[in-house]
Regions:
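Nucleotidyltransferase catalytic core that binds NTPs
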Residues: 2-169
Length: 169
């Protein structure tokens, strides 16, 4: 698809004036464990909202595992962060992301990638999700200043008694 300008000077995808960048791509799904939700996640949400009319932040959990934070606390924390953003919905789910995406009727799955290893893994997952549901995945590269930040690093720092507040929104 090509990007070109419409009569209003706004970029459009493929010449379709209904797909203005800055919203218009329908409903996106940002899945993750968000254990905890970091500044990196918040940056991906901000950038995804430039593309989608609505974004569902899907907090995934495995019933067989206990997370660092209970899933209910993760959902409540993220809801509180976005309480003034009506385009953000927060839900928890278990099972395959592709199945949850299909259930919600999303336009695309959004994933942040920090490294080439993340990219390769996410490309494989995107292919599987597309084959299962026909739903595409949009990969957003991490902002350079946040590329080294991950939930697992934050958990490890907290485990050793470090203040992690500067990594959290």
């Amino acid at each position: 698809m090509s990007l070109k300008d419409n009569k209003k000077g706004q970029s459009v995808v493929g010449g379709n004036d209904s797909l203005l960048l800055g919203g218009g791509l329908g409903r996106g799904l940002l899945p993750g464990s968000f254990d905890p939700f970091t500044l990196g996640h918040a940056d991906i949400v901000k950038r995804a909202l430039e593309l989608f009319d609505e974004l569902v932040i899907a907090v995934g959990y495995n019933e067989q595992k206990s997370g660092w934070m209970p899933v209910e606390e993760r959902v409540a924390t993220i809801k509180k962060l976005y309480k003034d953003e009506p385009r953000v919905k927060v839900e928890s789910y278990t099972g395959l992301t592709a199945d949850f995406a299909r259930k919600l009727g999303v336009t695309a799955i959004v994933r942040g990638v920090r490294t080439t290893a993340d990219f390769e893994y996410e490309m494989q997952m995107a292919d599987v999700n597309r084959r299962l549901t026909g739903i595409e995945t949009i990969l957003l590269p991490a902002s350079p200043q946040l590329a080294s930040l991950s939930s697992s690093i934050v958990r490890e720092l907290a485990h050793f008694g470090h203040d992690v507040s500067k990594f959290l929104p």
